[in-house]
Curated annotation (Swiss-Prot):
Mg(2+) binds at T51. Substrate binds at L12, Q13, G14, R27, T90, P210. GO terms for molecular function: 4 iron, 4 sulfur cluster binding; carbon-nitrogen lyase activity; identical protein binding; magnesium ion binding; protein homodimerization activity; S-adenosyl-L-methionine binding. This is 7-carboxy-7-deazaguanine synthase. [4Fe-4S] cluster binds at C31, C46, C49. Its EC number is 4.3.99.3.
Amino acid sequence: MTYAVKEIFYTLQGEGANAGRPAVFCRFAGCNLWSGREEDRAQAVCRFCDTDFVGTDGENGGKFKDADALVATIAGLWPAGEAHRFVVCTGGEPMLQLDQPLVDALHAAGFGIAIETNGSLPVLESIDWICVSPKADAPLVVTKGNELKVVIPQDNQRLADYAKLDFEYFLVQPMDGPSRDLNTKLAIDWCKRHPQWRLSMQTHKYLNIP
């Protein structure tokens, strides 16, 4: 299949359980919860998204004719001769495009694969690290994985229900924006009252990591 990718870049993972880990980020274009266009935000299921996933005009972005072509670009960004290859498939919603041929090609190239998904679409069991960031008004079909990362606050959100799911790590992350300081306090207070949960911060924004 042809893969539409917004951007591909090498950096450090800034948030979640893998914060600080070097990774190639492959941001797929498109999402099933929002068109990505500002004029549609009020009608979106996810109205707080802070990511540009529209089109294929970002760094190293484009339309890739097959899995091998996409993997070649991803692999070309990893430091030459270095092991511990790791790619984060994100979006948008990566499960609109991430398929078994691409997973197989990435594994063949020596990459561990993480996915950042909203959890409303089934994921492939062959993915190495599953991070689900559920949206309160969207269906949640992925109920087990490695990491559940919940952005707070959201309307109609019930964190206590998420705690019953089958994940290794449970994280709350304060929503960015003008209320970030208040949201951070809410997240800290939640973790202190419910020790099953950990705090996730978007460290790349605080440290200006590109």
